[in-house]
């Protein structure tokens, strides 16, 4: 049986991204992504969504999981950039 080590949760990732947005550490890719704006973030979300689909059709479950993690990251970057909170999204689940 494979042992899984939980590194991040959806909530902990959001907290990390929110912190980076507030503190703006030098050289942060997240800060650069936030500064690039909604158009750039939206393009990345579309790109990652396509990669999720391709991975689901043609790649391993590990590759699919990685692509999904990238889609979640970019979606949360957009949320932070737009000032949304997790609760704003949770209301619609």
Curated annotation (Swiss-Prot):
Q: Short name of one Pfam family for this protein?
A: PRA-PH
Q: Which GO terms describe its biological process?
A: L-histidine biosynthetic process
Record organism:
Rhodococcus opacus (strain B4)
What molecular functions are annotated in GO for this chain? ATP binding; phosphoribosyl-ATP diphosphatase activity
Entry protein name: Phosphoribosyl-ATP pyrophosphatase
Question: What is its pathway?
Answer: Amino-acid biosynthesis; L-histidine biosynthesis; L-histidine from 5-phospho-alpha-D-ribose 1-diphosphate: step 2/9
**CDD domains in the record, alphabetically?**
NTP-PPase_HisE (cd11547)
What gene is this protein translated from? hisE
Which Cys-Cys disulphide bridges does the record give?
none
Q: Which reaction(s) does the protein catalyse, per the Swiss-Prot or TrEMBL entry?
A: 1-(5-phospho-beta-D-ribosyl)-ATP + H2O = 1-(5-phospho-beta-D-ribosyl)-5'-AMP + diphosphate + H(+)
Q: Name the family the entry cites.
A: Belongs to the PRA-PH family.
**Which lineage is the organism of this entry classified under, starting from the top rank?**
Bacteria, Bacillati, Actinomycetota, Actinomycetes, Mycobacteriales
Which UniProt keywords are given for this protein, alphabetically ordered?
Amino-acid biosynthesis, ATP-binding, Cytoplasm, Histidine biosynthesis, Hydrolase, Nucleotide-binding
